[in-house]
Amino acid sequence: MLNIGIFGAPGSGKGTQSELISEKYSLYPISTGEILRREIKDKTELGKIAEEYINQGQLLPDYLTIRILVDLFDKVDNNKGYIFDGFPRTISQAKALDDLLKEQNTSIAIVFSLSVDEKELIRRLLKRGKLFSRKDDNLETIQNRLTVYREQTESVQEYYRKKGKLMEIIGKNSVEEVFENIVEKIDNLFR
């Protein structure tokens, strides 16, 4: 079973790369962001709670995010592995993910961190906001999301670095170049 994590600041391209990785390696994609947007659209109880946090540019509390993951693991019959898009975002979530995967006799093989400078992130997110009309892609919310990311998420890099599983990838290049770099790193795991 191959389990891969991919994270980076909002606008770093992790969703796009996650889709490409999922297709190439037949991994089940898990994007807590996508799950939450679906819950919000469907106006579920979880969706209403999540919407309040997202509209303020805040991360959901760990217990809610982990609940989403546990529910998903219970529903999905998967033996190839997972690609975790934007998860985990905190040390607590990383440890919970380790425990959940251990119950399935597997673990995270590699975690990619996409690095893009802040000006480029803001440019990408403002462009995306115009294209897709996402409420959370306005300048004030974007700046708050980037601050929250730096404060709460970057510690996860250190967690995986200490485990020898972190691979930093320059995310400013073309989608194709970034993907080629990622594929090379994954394939090197099996050589």
Swiss-Prot record:
EC class of the enzyme, as a word: transferase
Residues covered by region (LID): 127-137
GO terms for cellular component: cytoplasm
EC number: 2.7.4.3
Pfam families tied to this protein: ADK
Region called NMP, residue ranges: 31-60
Catalytic activity of the protein: AMP + ATP = 2 ADP
Compartments in which it is found: Cytoplasm
Coiled-coil annotated spans: none
InterPro entries in the cross-refs: Adenylat/UMP-CMP_kin, Adenylat_kinase_CS, P-loop_NTPase
Single GO MF annotation: ATP binding
Transmembrane segments: none
BP GO annotations: AMP salvage
Keywords: ATP-binding, Cytoplasm, Kinase, Nucleotide biosynthesis, Nucleotide-binding, Transferase
Record: residues binding AMP: 32, 37, 58-60, 86-89, 93, 134, 145
UniProt cross-references to CDD domains, sorted A to Z: ADK
Family as reported in the entry's similarity comment: Belongs to the adenylate kinase family.
Quaternary structure (record): Monomer.
Function field: Catalyzes the reversible transfer of the terminal phosphate group between ATP and AMP. Plays an important role in cellular energy homeostasis and in adenine nucleotide metabolism.
Name the record gives this protein: Adenylate kinase
Gene source species: Azobacteroides pseudotrichonymphae genomovar. CFP2
